[in-house]
Amino acid sequence: EEGLGWATEGWTAAKAYDGGQPTGAPDRAGKPLTVVDVPKLIGIGYFNATSKGMQDAAKELGNVTVTTDGPTKANIDEQITFIDNYITQGVNGVLFAANDPVAIAPVLQKALDAGIHVVGYDANSVPEAREWFVNQAEFNGIGKAMIDSLVAEQGDSAAFGIVTST
């Protein structure tokens, strides 16, 4: 569509697999699955939207139950505690958006060692601590596309500001 060229410029080819492996994961084909989503924090628009998308996908699949749970502030220690508690409960999968890519790795490895599938989104961990990481686009591609779009709209001498947060 016209006007969406910037959105596709940041896309890249699929990356080769670089993740860890669960140990002794049981064959769950056709059986009920319990998955927990532990984002950086709960109660904000972005993670409310990802949670809704996961709920919608679970409903489509039919045999998946997804629970979104996590800290109300972006706190890695609390996030680790949530994941550890769900490992103890015996979930089949952990979805996460890491508050700290290194600090979260041991609890994710613990999940893998327990045969639990681990997938990150939005904010990665170290690769060996999860199976897959899903990201919307690469940051440098998004940034380049945004600046290219700005220049196309305003010219190459326009003034602009950048606002960011964590």
Task: Report residues per predicted region.
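A residue-level marker of the well-folded mature domains of exported/periplasmic proteins
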Residues: E1-T166
